[in-house]
Curated annotation (Swiss-Prot):
It catalyses: 1,6-anhydro-N-acetyl-beta-muramate + ATP + H2O = N-acetyl-D-muramate 6-phosphate + ADP + H(+). It comes from Actinobacillus pleuropneumoniae serotype 5b (strain L20). SUPFAM superfamilies: Actin-like ATPase domain. This is Anhydro-N-acetylmuramic acid kinase. The keyword Transferase applies. The lineage of its organism: Bacteria, Pseudomonadati, Pseudomonadota, Gammaproteobacteria, Pasteurellales. Pathway: Amino-sugar metabolism; 1,6-anhydro-N-acetylmuramate degradation; Cell wall biogenesis; peptidoglycan recycling. ATP binds at G12, T13, S14, L15, D16, G17, V18, D19.
């Protein structure tokens, strides 16, 4: 059978590295046929982390990081294809998200910025590359995010149940797939970002593996209440957020004196905050039908988070996308392969019910090989 392969490439707010996956669109539904990961080089991660945390840089530095990211994507793709015995001619197109460095969808001059020079990606791989997916949605009045729910709808929706796909990356976002209703999707809260930043500050680790550190801590109710008292949670959907809100500076403002607490107690509280802020939103969506929560992203491998979701959502079946045929670490990368497929065929790939756009459009800028 003839294959119709597209390569999705994603690097998220966690800055851990580059996810890559190949989707075969000759299959119905499309099938994930290969996936891989390239760690972010430490020097590039440090520069990106500083840029994300401060929002400040020089044009010279920004241009250099843009170039370095483009090279990282290109080299990651070439190595990935070689490892899976694929050639450039096997791939119809690449869908590459780029690296978000700022997302500001509100105000008089809404904008979003993803960097990583896609001219380098197309030139170095010899594969047509699709990128810059978010700005056209914003140009027609949308938030530019989230883009993945349209893909979730095609893969996971069922007329028999309410399905919510929860992606726990740096930020937590959901796709709400309700029978006979338009799909909606939006950012609901922080994901791993605060927990990752906190353990990096105190233990120089990138993340709290298996919640081992958080499990040694004790919940701080007063801090939890303060964190949950955040105006973002009261905003109507669709809405989007990022590290420009949920960061260590925000955390410090939410507590009179963070240093008065044991760091592990703060970590346990941040884990609980991540769960409860999401659960509060999910409970507003509960229906009489069966309710299924499908978790994906790095946070779906956190046993403490998954345990607390199960405990706080007794009416829901709580599972991961692994159990439904899509590796939890590669759902977003798979979505960008789908977005590229739609763009190449000039099909719409945004959902106005999700982003708030005035009309459906075909997102993505084409960089020919």
């Amino acid at each position: 059978m003839t294959k119709n392969l597209y390569l999705g490439v994603m690097s998220g707010t966690s800055l851990d590295g580059v996810d890559l996956c190949v989707m075969d669109f000759a299959k119905n539904p499309p099938k994930l046929t290969a996936c891989g990961f390239t760690p972010m080089p430490e020097d590039l991660r440090t520069d990106l982390s500083h840029l994300l945390k401060s929002g400040e840089t020089s044009l010279q530095k920004l241009g250099e990081i843009d170039h370095r990211l483009g090279l990282l994507y290109a080299e990651s793709i070439k190595r990935f294809l070689a490892e899976h015995q694929l050639s450039a001619s096997d791939i119809q197109a690449i869908g590459c998200h780029g690296q978000t460095v700022w997302h500001s969808p509100n105000g008089n001059f809404p904008f979003t910025m993803q960097i990583g020079d896609m001219n380098l990606v197309a030139a170095h791989t010899g594969i047509t590359t699709i990128a810059d997916f978010r700005r056209k949605d914003m140009a027609v009045g949308g938030q530019g995010a989230p883009l993945v729910p349209a893909f979730h709808e095609g893969i996971f929706a069922s007329p028999e149940r309410l399905t919510v796909v929860l992606n726990i990356g740096g930020i937590s976002n959901i796709s709400v797939l309700a029978p006979q209703q338009p799909t909606i999707g939006y950012d609901v809260s922080v994901g791993n970002a605060l927990m990752d930043s906190w353990i990096e500050l105190h233990q120089a680790k990138r993340y709290d593996k298996n919640a081992e550190w958080a499990k040694t801590g004790t919940l701080i109710p007063a801090l939890l209440d303060s964190l949950l008292d955040e105006p973002f949670f009261k905003l109507p959907a669709p809405k989007s957020t990022g590290r420009e809100l949920f960061n260590l500076e925000w955390l410090a403002k939410k507590s009179a004196n963070l240093t008065a607490y044991r760091p592990e107690d703060v970590q346990r509280t941040l884990a609980e905050f991540t769960v409860q802020s999401v659960v509060n939103e999910l409970k507003t969506l509960e229906s009489e039908k069966q309710c299924l929560l499908l978790a994906c992203g790095g946070g779906a491998r956190n046993p403490l988070l998954m345990q607390r979701f199960s405990e706080l959502l007794p009416k829901w079946q709580v599972a991961t996308t692994d159990e439904y045929g899509l590796d939890i670490d590669y759902v977003e990368a798979a979505a960008f392969a789908w977005l590229a497929y739609q763009r190449v065929h000039n099909l719409t790939n945004n959902l106005p019910s999700v982003t708030g756009a005035k009309e459906p459009v075909s997102l993505g800028v084409i960089y020919p090989k």
